Structures are given as structure tokens and as C-alpha cells.
A protein has these predicted regions:
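Amphipathic alpha-helical dimerization/coiled-coil segments
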Residues: 1-22, 40-45, 94-122
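A generic local structural motif
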Residues: 25, 75-76
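N-terminal helix-turn-helix DNA-binding core of bacterial DNA-binding proteins
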Residues: 17, 21-62, 84, 88-96
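Alpha-helical residues within the helix-turn-helix
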Residues: 57, 74-75
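Short coil turns linking two alpha-helices in DNA-binding domains
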Residues: 62, 67-69
Length: 122
């Protein structure tokens, strides 16, 4: 298991576990153009998120299609949904976004040792 530290504030950290299977599922969800557009729109919206109707208007996506794509993003943990009165709000789970980015970049530029390199060194 891979562990990524997420900074909540200057003095608070906690660990989110991330593995290749989880990361692949999240990247697969973002690999669809409509879901990527939804996600980027929600990132722009910030912590308050957007109501589903506003997402639909902004992206000109049919309601049933939008519902399907939002459900996929929520299933993989990238988007949170909640009800406020009669409206459903969607927002990005920024801790999970940071965990995914951390997973992708954790070992950046640390070098790679291939089997042949190890044998040559021996």
C-alpha cells in the first residue's frame, strides 16, 4: 500500500492510503471527456460546489447523462454529493484529489534501477 500525507492545515496532517488499483480507477473515471469537464468545472467552483442543474446548464449535458457521469465520479471518491433543501450539490473531494496527485508524483525523479543494471553492478 502507498501512503500519501495530506496537509489539512499548517500543523495537521493525516494519511490517505492509495494503491495502484484505486489510482487507476480514479484516472479511468477522469479519462472520459464529459467526466473530465464536470470535474474541472467543479474544481473551478471551489469548496461550495455547484447544484446539478447549474452543471447541466454550464456543460449542456442531458440530465440522465450527467447523472451517470456524476455517479461514476462519486463512486471512485473524486466527487461528493449532498442535498441542501431540494437541490443536490456536487463538489470535489480535494483531499482525494491531492492523494491521487501525490500518488502519481511521490517517487518523481528518484531514479530507476533495472534488473540488468543491478547485474552489471555485481
Amino acid at each position: 500500500n502507498f501512503r500519501n500525507t495530506v496537509v489539512l492545515s499548517e500543523n495537521t496532517h493525516y494519511i490517505i492510503s492509495m494503491n495502484e488499483e484505486t489510482a487507476a480507477g480514479r484516472l479511468e473515471a477522469l479519462g472520459h471527456q464529459t467526466r473530465l469537464s464536470i470535474y474541472r468545472l467543479l474544481v473551478k467552483a471551489g469548496d461550495d460546489g455547484l447544484i446539478v442543474g447549474d452543471i447541466q446548464k454550464a456543460l449542456d449535458v442531458p440530465a440522465s447523462t450527467l447523472s451517470h457521469h456524476l455517479a461514476k465520479l462519486a463512486r471512485v471518491g473524486l466527487v461528493s454529493q449532498g442535498r441542501r433543501g431540494r437541490e443536490i450539490y456536487c463538489s470535489v473531494d480535494y483531499d482525494e484529489m491531492r492523494a491521487l496527485i501525490g500518488f502519481l508524483t511521490e517517487e518523481c525523479c528518484t531514479g530507476v534501477t533495472l534488473e540488468q543494471d543491478a547485474q552489471d553492478a555485481a
